[in-house]
Amino acid sequence: MNQEDNTGGGGIFGLFKWTKDALFGTDISPSMKYKDQEERRDRSRYAQDDTNFSMKFGNDSNRRSTNLSRSNSWSGLDSTLHRKYELLPEYNENGFNSIVNGDHHSKERIRSLRSPAPIVPREPLRNEPTDTFGHRLHTKRRTINELSNSQIPFIPPQEDDPLLSKLFNKDGVNEVRRSPYKLSVKDIPGKFPSPLTKRDEIDNYYVRDEDACHKNREYKKAYFDLFAQMDLNSRDLEDLCEDVREQREQFHRNEQTYKQAYEEMRAELVNELKKSKTLFENYYSLGQKYKSLKKVLDQTISHEAELATSRERLYQEEDLKNFEIQTLKQRLSDLELKYTNLQIEKDMQRDNYESEIHDLLLQLSLRNNERKDTSAGSNIFSTGQ
């Protein structure tokens, strides 16, 4: 027995080592440990104990968490484990190795014993350091939109919040930090105690519980004082809001009055500007008319001077024309008299010419008659021969 204990390959020490390895993990790599098990090849990570979970989470909300499961004492019962710890293999009723010979019922029994128990995920209330079940690792993370649709998002207070600053003042915080007892999630019932819990802390649990109750009463009193102060502040705030509302209404009334006065003054100023513009336009038109009239007056004076000169010249020309007219009238009367005399003389000459023409025609007719008589006598004489 002592020799077996010293070798570390079996006996009590071997059983202790096997139990320790089964609970807290072994030095065997997962690839070697589960090499011959086809049903476990799709698993990427393994959990050796409730306190030894590992899982990778991403920031992506759509990434699904890998379901981790608890291992038990039947995990890793393969030929390698039997050879390492010098364990006897399992035999069936016929005396053969049930795993090697392929006994279906034995394999199912071993598989059911080796398969870990399922863990039901739940929503973690807080980040507990002693939560050995790792529930928060199996919880599906919800997106911000899902949280906003289901409930109002929690907004933490700022560091400079007056209520929190008064409730948790600097002295009180330092006192809590210096105290040996600190209220944490380890004191919540239903959780496993931390392995690092000191013995004196466990012994002084009731004393610390009384201190915590006393501090809780102090906190309640401080809360009630703060609530009373908040009530007074709310009343002061309501009064202040009422004053602000009245001042705002007065400001709006004054603004409306000023606006109306401004509109009236602006309309009056616009009318005055229009009148001034009309007056300036009339003054400008009168000035232009005055200049044009003055120019016309100057032209009229010059024209009157020219007219007087022209009148004198016309008078002189009129006298000359009158004299010429008299001269021409005299000449015309002389010419008319001369024309009358010439006409009378012409009539007398015409009468003389007509009488001469009549005499000549008479002589011509007589000569023609004589010629006719002579020619007739000669014709008669020629016919008689």
Curated annotation (Swiss-Prot):
GO cellular component, one term: spindle pole body
Molecular functions per Gene Ontology: structural molecule activity
Signal peptide limits: none
Major localization listed first in the record, in broad terms: cytoplasm
Compartment(s): Cytoplasm, Cytoskeleton, Microtubule organizing center, Spindle pole body
Biased composition (Low complexity): 64-75
Annotated positions of the Phosphoserine modification: S29, S73, S115
UniProt keyword terms in alphabetical order: Coiled coil, Cytoplasm, Cytoskeleton, Phosphoprotein
Coiled coil stretches, renumbered: 229-355
A Pfam entry, by short name: BBP1_C
Region ranges (Disordered): 34-76
Positions with biased composition (Basic and acidic residues): 34-48
One GO process term, biological-process aspect: mitotic spindle pole body localization
Keyword DNA-binding among record annotations: no
Free-text function comment from the UniProt entry: Component of the spindle pole body (SPB) required for insertion of the nascent SPB into the nuclear envelope and for the proper execution of spindle pole body (SPB) duplication. Connects the central plaque of the SPB with the half-bridge. Required for proper localization of CDC5 at the SPB and for proper M-phase progression.
Free-text note on domains in this protein's UniProt record: The C-ter coiled-coil domain is sufficient for localization and homodimerization.
Oligomer status and interactors: Homodimer. Interacts with KAR1, MPS2 and SPC29.
Miscellaneous comment: Present with 922 molecules/cell in log phase SD medium.
UniProt record similarity statement: Belongs to the BBP1 family.
Name used for this protein in its record: Spindle pole component BBP1
Naturally occurring in which organism (per UniProt): Saccharomyces cerevisiae (strain ATCC 204508 / S288c) (Baker's yeast)
Underlying gene: BBP1
